[in-house]
């Protein structure tokens, strides 16, 4: 879940308004917030964007970030000696024989082709190196933008403005219009103009394109209630069958079955996004893992401990990678320190894709965006909509 990180180097200072008596005015300073080890590591990947005089530093002149401490499951030999000691090859532990994957699927590769790693000191943590082809990744990206962000699911925009239907489809129309205008080919009679969206009070909102750029998260299944931090049967929407099948197959292959995804958060990161160290502990069922799947740009993910006072392990998560946080890691702080600059997976770009898919990939690439889908079982005994797939299907 999201958490806002306050800058502990910034203190609130209250002074008298009477400048003439400033020498005798009482000044109070609130205690500086402790910089935890989690925050210290997170800040290693924070780029300085302003000079001492407050002016913006051009991107090309900024001090580059040192990514050498980041563990990389994709390039094992490029890791530091310290990080190499943390990597456990768990590929042989993947279950491929206890049941038959009898039918081919358009959504993922067969588990016998998966490469799976663990992390020393974190039993129950698994990293699956992307088990998707580029076309399979784009099917999930399409779902995330078209289906998962639309009503009846909640997102950060509809939470305040009410349901907004067809956010992507209308945003895409405006994106096409912008492109045609830039090429001098725009003709209002030929291009369908989406009606300006209205909020729940009937007041006009920004354009769909502007709203789309503000999209940060959406929720599936049980709609997480952010303020009280709970799930309620009162707020439930049907969980997508294909996503349910995918995460259950992942759970079976990594011996976390039976597993029923009852809720998911879909996060939409842009190049400047981070996520502070947090726990996912609102679920009644904590023995089942969080299954997290990412597409688009590369992130520096921080796998922490049960307290923020222990330094987390930074690791790269690339497009298509899956992280499974079970066992000890289910109870540990974690977050996203950085979306790596210019890291969008260029393998997702294909001139043979249809125009709609091209625009989705273009939208992700233009702001170095990342889509993350993370699922969890909420109750010890699955309730509304909870169902197990047939292992032998």
UniProtKB/Swiss-Prot annotation:
2-oxoglutarate binds at residues 267-269, 370-376. One of its GO terms (cellular component) is nucleus. Its cofactor is Fe(2+). The lineage of its organism: Eukaryota, Amoebozoa, Evosea, Eumycetozoa, Dictyostelia. It comes from the Eukaryota. Substrate binds at residues 217, 224-226, 308. Belongs to the alkB family. GO terms for molecular function: broad specificity oxidative DNA demethylase activity; ferrous iron binding; oxidative RNA demethylase activity. Its EC number is 1.14.11.-. This is Alpha-ketoglutarate-dependent dioxygenase alkB. InterPro entries: Alkb, AlkB-like, AlkB-like_sf. Putative dioxygenase that may repair alkylated DNA or RNA by oxidative demethylation. Requires molecular oxygen, alpha-ketoglutarate and iron. Fe cation binds at residues 278, 280, 334. GO terms for biological process: DNA repair; oxidative RNA demethylation.
């Amino acid at each position: 879940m999201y958490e806002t990180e306050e800058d502990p180097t910034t203190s609130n200072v209250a002074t008298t308004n009477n400048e003439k008596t400033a020498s005798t005015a009482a000044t109070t300073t609130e205690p500086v917030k402790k910089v935890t080890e989690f925050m210290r590591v997170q800040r290693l990947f924070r780029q300085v964007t302003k000079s001492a005089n407050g002016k913006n530093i051009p991107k090309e002149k900024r001090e580059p970030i040192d990514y050498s401490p980041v563990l990389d499951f994709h390039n094992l030999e490029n890791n530091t000696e310290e990080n190499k000691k943390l990597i456990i090859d768990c590929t042989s532990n993947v279950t491929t024989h206890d049941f038959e994957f009898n039918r081919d699927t358009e959504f993922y590769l067969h588990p016998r082709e998966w490469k799976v790693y663990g992390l020393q000191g974190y039993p129950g943590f698994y990293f699956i190196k992307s088990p998707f082809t580029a076309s399979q990744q784009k099917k999930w990206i399409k779902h995330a933008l078209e289906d998962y962000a639309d009503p009846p699911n909640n997102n950060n925009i509809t939470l305040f403005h009410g349901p907004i239907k067809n956010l992507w489809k209308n945003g895409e129309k405006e994106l096409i219009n912008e492109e045609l205008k830039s090429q001098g080919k725009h003709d209002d009679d030929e291009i369908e103009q989406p009606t300006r969206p209205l909020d729940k009070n009937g007041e006009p909102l920004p354009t769909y394109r502007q709203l789309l750029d503000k999209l940060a998260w959406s929720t599936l299944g049980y709609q997480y209630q952010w303020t009280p931090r709970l799930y309620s049967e009162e707020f439930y929407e049907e969980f997508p069958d294909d996503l349910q099948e995918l995460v259950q197959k992942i759970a079976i292959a990594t011996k976390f079955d039976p597993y029923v995804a009852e809720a998911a958060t879909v996060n939409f990161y842009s190049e400047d996004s981070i996520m502070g160290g947090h726990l996912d502990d609102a679920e009644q069922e904590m023995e089942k893992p969080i299954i997290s799947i990412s597409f688009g740009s590369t992130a520096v993910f921080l796998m922490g401990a049960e307290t923020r006072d222990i330094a987390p392990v930074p690791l790269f998560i690339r497009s298509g990678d899956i992280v499974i946080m079970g066992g000890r890691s289910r109870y540990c702080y974690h977050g996203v320190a950085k979306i790596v600059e210019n890291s969008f997976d260029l393998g997702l770009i294909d001139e043979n894709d249809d125009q709609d898919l091209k625009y989705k990939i273009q939208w992700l690439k233009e702001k170095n965006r990342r889509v993350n889908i993370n699922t969890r079982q909420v109750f010890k005994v699955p309730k509304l909509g909870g169902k197990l797939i047939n292992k032998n299907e």
